[in-house]
UniProtKB/Swiss-Prot annotation:
Alphabetical UniProt keywords: Ribonucleoprotein, Ribosomal protein
Keyword Ubl conjugation appears in the UniProt entry: no
Organism whose genome encodes this protein: Spodoptera frugiperda (Fall armyworm)
GO molecular function, one term: structural constituent of ribosome
Gene: RpL32
Protein name per Swiss-Prot or TrEMBL: Large ribosomal subunit protein eL32
Length: 134
């Protein structure tokens, strides 16, 4: 049986579109990644009507649902079994995510221990070799 979170509120994002950089559509050398405009005459900085919107504190998420995954858990990065056991009492609130640099041998032990402790692992299938390949 899969572990379910304590409660699963509806996660509301105030804005899902990305904020794009001013004039990034005009020049290829300007990437779309957001940069704050700092020019004295810049219309985006001065918030003229019809211009790109700037990110500000008002777009922030609800404090209760911030950093929450769609399944209702918050993820914690885990490098070894000892770090996994910290989540033992909080397994209905947090789920584990195995770090990128962990070897496939250690991943296997982490996933097995997580099943014993009934902790959900988000990337449990990653880099696990099957029997026929060995």
């Amino acid at each position: 049986m899969a572990i379910r979170p304590v409660y699963r509120p509806t996660i509301v994002k105030k804005r899902t579109k990305r904020f794009i950089r001013h004039q990034s559509d005009r020049y290829d050398k300007l990437k779309r990644n957001w940069r704050k405009p700092r020019g004295i005459d810049n219309r985006v900085r001065r918030r003229f009507k019809g211009q790109y919107l700037m990110p500000n504190i008002g777009y922030g998420s609800n404090k209760k649902t911030r950093h929450m995954l769609p399944n209702g858990f918050r993820k914690v990065l885990v490098h070894n079994v000892r770090e996994l056991e910290i989540l033992m009492m909080q397994n209905r609130k947090y789920c584990a995510e195995i770090a990128h640099g962990v070897s496939s041998k250690k991943r296997k032990t982490i996933v097995e221990r997580a099943q014993q402790l009934s902790i959900r692992v988000t990337n449990s299938a990653a880099r696990l070799r099957s029997q026929e390949n060995e």
